[in-house]
């Protein structure tokens, strides 16, 4: 009788405990679902915007960037929202007509007001950085350069954005900002932090060097193997995300592809006769009339200036790659180097180190040849062969083959391709082997490779000197531990259910 009573009590307790466990499990499932839905509920997008105008020597581009405000100091989160090319030449060409600058900028600035929400416009910074074209204008006339920048500032202040200034950036800044841009977008500045992650300096990701070619200047920037540079003026120091960088950077003013062509013409016309210049850097059959006043209208050709017996001369193409190459090398002065190693014109250049991203005109010209060769530009030798063959084509055939390409660019591709090969090989000391380390970049993660993003990141202090704090546990470790503890909990519940459903296995009578 006592046994029957005891058995009933045990069954009653077991049922009640099972009911409580079942009810608790249902509540737990509901709670997990509620937490999951709450955690994954999309939040209102909190986005910030920034505008940078790249006032180059040949044209002006406007870039609108956006990034999530809560991830402002993360690497690689800034995205290019919109790009607008301002119609017309570079702002330096408006030195004598500054009253036209407002209309010049109007279309792209109006587009900006349409792309950026009105509620965000007052806190959207606007920066204008002018490069080599304005550096050259300032060399000719500081007053004219100041008047252009003042007119630009008046125009940009009239829009509902937070105008932060218009300035002429130095060649060093241009090189450094380009280096920051490509390494930021490639994620080269940060390492994933965790309690299990110990990374030595030798294991950290190597940065890319930066090669920039514009219309009026070219820049080379990279982290050299030897951190002590022979020419201190070519060195810059950065502390980014907790890592110190010593960067070599130099800008060669007058060696952008447009000014380099003017230099070559000014040099070659000195030994021509009769107002005709036979030029191997243009296609056979190509003809163009050049005004002497325009030829000597830039500071880059002043060293070649002399009194000519004519006001105009005609360029007649002969299309010979080897002769073109030799004529280009003449204005790379390699006769004197006061350092252990130089680029050209006696400028110190340490041994090249690592991979390089080549952008701006480097990319645009190489992309043309790559498409022309059906993506078969695999080596320096192949690029040389393609350029050599292209230069020898008759001008009429070239025009017929590429009817959609603007004649100015098309007519200069022979020179541009030859100049890039000469600059990289004889100017910057790349070889057929190290050529493979050059990566020609147009966009990285949908953002333009170039100095503008690095410029904005610097001015908005969006790259901290120290690595942002990360959670004690990485997300993957957190998930793993949660799964482990959940499995342990489930195992305990199953064991408990088994105990109460099969009490005879565990509740033995004492002997």
UniProtKB/Swiss-Prot annotation:
Its EC number is 3.6.1.5. Keywords: ATP-binding, Calcium, Disulfide bond, Glycoprotein, Hydrolase, Magnesium, Membrane, Nucleotide-binding, Transmembrane, Transmembrane helix. It is found in: Membrane; Membrane, Caveola. One of its GO terms (molecular function) is ATP hydrolysis activity. N-glycosylated. The N-terminus is blocked. Residues 46-171 are annotated as: N-terminal lobe. Expressed in primary neurons and astrocytes, kidney, liver, muscle, thymus, lung and spleen. Belongs to the GDA1/CD39 NTPase family. This is Ectonucleoside triphosphate diphosphohydrolase 1. The gene is Entpd1.
């Amino acid at each position: 009788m006592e046994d029957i009573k005891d058995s009933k009590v045990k069954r009653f307790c077991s049922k009640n405990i099972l009911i409580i466990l079942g009810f608790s499990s249902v509540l737990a499932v509901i709670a997990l679902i509620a937490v999951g839905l709450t955690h994954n509920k999309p939040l209102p997008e909190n986005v910030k915007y920034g505008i940078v105008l790249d006032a180059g020597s040949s044209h002006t581009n406007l870039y609108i960037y956006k990034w999530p405000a809560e991830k402002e100091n993360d690497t690689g989160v800034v995205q290019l929202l919109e790009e607008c090319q301002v119609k017309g030449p570079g702002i330096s060409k408006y030195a004598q007509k500054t009253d036209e600058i407002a209309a010049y900028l109007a279309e792209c600035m109006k587009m900006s007001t349409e792309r950026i929400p009105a509620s965000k416009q007052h806190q959207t910074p606007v920066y204008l950085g002018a490069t080599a074209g304005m550096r050259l204008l300032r060399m000719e006339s500081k007053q004219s350069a100041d008047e252009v920048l003042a007119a630009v500032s008046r125009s940009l202040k009239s829009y509902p954005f937070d105008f932060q200034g218009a300035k002429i950036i130095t060649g060093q800044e241009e090189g450094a900002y380009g280096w920051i841009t490509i390494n930021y977008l490639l994620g080269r500045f940060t390492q994933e932090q965790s309690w299990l992650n110990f990374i030595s300096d030798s294991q950290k990701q190597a940065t890319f060097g930066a090669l920039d070619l514009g219309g009026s200047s070219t820049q080379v920037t990279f982290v050299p193997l030897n951190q002590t540079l022979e020419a201190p003026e070519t060195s810059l120091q950065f502390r980014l995300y907790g890592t110190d960088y010593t960067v070599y950077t130099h800008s060669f003013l007058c060696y952008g592809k447009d000014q380099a062509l003017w230099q070559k013409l000014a040099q070659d016309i000195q030994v021509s006769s009769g107002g005709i210049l036979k030029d191997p850097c243009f296609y056979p059959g190509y003809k163009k009339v050049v005004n002497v006043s325009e030829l000597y209208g830039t500071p880059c050709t002043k060293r070649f200036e002399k009194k000519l017996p004519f006001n105009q001369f005609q360029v007649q193409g002969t299309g010979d790659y080897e002769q073109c190459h030799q004529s280009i090398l003449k204005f790379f002065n390699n006769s004197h180097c006061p350092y252990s190693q130089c680029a050209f014109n006696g400028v110190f250049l340490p041994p090249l180190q690592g991979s390089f991203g080549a952008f701006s005109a480097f990319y645009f010209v190489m992309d043309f040849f790559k498409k022309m060769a059906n993506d078969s530009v695999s080596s320096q030798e192949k690029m040389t062969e393609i350029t050599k063959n292209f230069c020898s084509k008759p001008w009429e055939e070239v025009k017929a083959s590429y009817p959609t390409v603007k004649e100015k660019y098309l007519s200069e591709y022979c020179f541009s391709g030859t100049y890039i090969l000469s600059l990289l090989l004889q100017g910057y000391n790349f070889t057929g082997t190290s050529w493979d380390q050059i990566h020609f970049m147009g966009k990285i993660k949908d953002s333009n490779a170039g100095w503008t993003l690095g410029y904005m990141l610097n001015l908005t202090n969006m790259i901290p000197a120290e690595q942002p704090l990360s959670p004690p546990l990485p997300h993957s470790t957190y998930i793993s531990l949660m799964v482990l503890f959940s499995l342990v909990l489930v195992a305990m519940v199953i064991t408990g259910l088994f105990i109460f459903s099969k009490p005879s296995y565990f509740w033995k009578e004492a002997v």
